[in-house]
Amino acid sequence: MLVLKFVCLLASVAAAKPTSWSSHKVVEHLESAPEGWRIVGAADPAAVIDFWLAIERENPEQLYDTIYDVSTPGRARYGKHLKREELDDLLRPRVETSEGIISWLTNGGVKPQGIRDEGDWIRFSTDVKTAEQLMKTQFHVFKDDVSSVSRIRTLEYSVPASISSHVQMIQPTTLFGRQKPQNSLILSPLTTDLEAMSEEEFSASNCRSLVTTACLRELYGLGDRVTQARDDNRIGVSGFLEEYAQYRDLDLFLSRFEPSAKGFNFSEGLIAGGKNTQGGPGSSTEANLDMQYVVGLSHKAKVTYYSTAGRGPLIPDLSQPDQASNDNEPYLEQLRYLVKLPKNQLPSVLSTSYGDTEQSLPASYTKATCDLFAQLGTMGVSVIFSSGDTGPGSSCQTNDGKNSTRFNPIYPASCPFVTSIGGTVGTEPERAVSFSSGGFSDRFPRPQYQDNAVKGYLKILGNQWSGLFNPNGRAFPDIAAQGSNYAVYDKGRMTGVSGTSASAPAMAAIIAQLNDFRLAKGSPVLGFLNPWIYSKGFSGFTDIVDGGSRGCTGYDIYSGLKAKRVPYASWNATKGWDPVTGFGTPNFQALTKVLP
């Protein structure tokens, strides 16, 4: 996970703004480039960039009121999820707002055929030279010394004052952050003779050393239950960073661990040029982990692997980086694709095992994408995210130029409209796994649905870690599942994988099972889960009171760079909600009794 430690840059550019720029207003400004990123040259003026412009809603509370109305048990609209057309009507800006923005673009040199009005978003393509004139900025090529990735970016951009109140953000401009699979980097071939192991050895008792579907079924009370094949209970799995789910590996996995599911498969949703190449040399561990446990735990459900392009090959000529590598923003591509699907094609559950430190992303970007998760929630999608694998933090310092010691919340796990999944390990007792991320958002205030649970934890915590986190921020994770040493087939071999990236798909499959249970009784799918979990559903989870997370060791676990050290930094598992396992792990039978 890249950490932003800022270094000063482009001060002379800021000081040399022409007076004609005074009619413009700055939308976003970074003091300097992120840690590990350095400027390597000016951007090619002819390079074409595809931009996303998010229109600021005149009444942002309307979306939030709607998602809580359809997601909070007891309210009159509970379960009455919106159709896509109803959501479009809710979000559509005034005609004059869109026309004003489009007029600015065309008058500034953007060709009309390069503009696409999508209601609350406007997409436009133009070259760097035109973009610089439009946004009163200068684009440069920045290189990340850790990954060798290069991107065309800027540190500040502006729009005319006359439309500034309508522009929430334009990207890619100031977005340097890079998604990472939420695994704890424990990837090792399993030496156990799997063929010689009996079915009993794959049971809950063996979760101590190896997690399989049989282990999870017994531990979480699923038994032999499978979902029914129906169009209104689909599961989506997010794929990024050229991770491709392999059909052959899934078949090997099912043959060994879920023989009754052999022959079941998944479909593909390829977004913005995304692929799902079979048999290639690239990494497939994360994708295989996700698909094998989602299909294995709910094999009759319709499962789709949504593969979104967003990072191409390395660029040999850094002054002219490859467009596909540097300027395609995969979260926005995926989310905009999903919210435009007809309701009968939407997944009821979406599992994603990727994230980044919250502070490494522009504030406008986290707000805009979090709102897109809320939009999915209004249409009945349970959005599941892994909480991360850095405990309270990895670098444990701010990126505002002050380098202050601070815990690092993870996004999108910190968005209040997703359900964040922490990690556990072992049985009898099941306990928090040390890498499970959690904490409190520095961007999003604590939602009301969390108040009672989180205030109770903060009272127990007292002054410990005071000043290192925001006690009024959205707290995460919400719940947890096993996260250590999952048996996964990858490239034909068994591998052990650890991380909350494993916890998320396991939980997604269990939520799909709960949806199946409700649909069989004539009730709608659960949709956005958190208001139910925090009001009543928590009693269907097993409270985890042993173990805790750890972090802030003095070195960033991804870059290896020296960082802040906080002795004994940890969130402990406690009675009730805590920021390492949330309310705990699922008990399927108990959950069926507290469903709305």
Swiss-Prot record:
Binding site for Ca(2+): 543-544, 576, 578
Signal peptide range in chain numbering: 1-16
Record note on cofactor: Binds 1 Ca(2+) ion per subunit.
Glycosylation, residue list: 265, 403, 572
Active site as annotated: 286, 290, 501
Domain Peptidase S53: 210-596
EC nos: 3.4.14.10
GO biological process, one term: proteolysis
Pfam families according to UniProt: Peptidase_S8 (PF00082), Pro-kuma_activ (PF09286)
GO molecular function: metal ion binding; serine-type endopeptidase activity; tripeptidyl-peptidase activity
Origin superkingdom: Eukaryota
Coiled-coil intervals, chain numbering: none
Any one GO cellular component localisation term in the record: extracellular region
Proregion positions: 18-203
Enzyme class label: hydrolase
PROSITE patterns found in the cross-reference section: SEDOLISIN
Subcellular location as annotated: Secreted, Extracellular space
InterPro entries named among the record's database cross-references: Peptidase_S8/S53_dom, Peptidase_S8/S53_dom_sf, Peptidase_S8_Ser-AS, S53_propep, Sedolisin_dom, Tripeptidyl-peptidase_I
Keywords: Calcium, Glycoprotein, Hydrolase, Metal-binding, Protease, Secreted, Serine protease, Signal, Virulence, Zymogen
Cited function: Secreted tripeptidyl-peptidase which degrades proteins at acidic pHs and is involved in virulence.
Protein name (record): Tripeptidyl-peptidase SED2
Organism: Arthroderma otae (strain ATCC MYA-4605 / CBS 113480)
Organism placement in taxonomy: Eukaryota, Fungi, Dikarya, Ascomycota, Pezizomycotina
Gene (UniProt): SED2
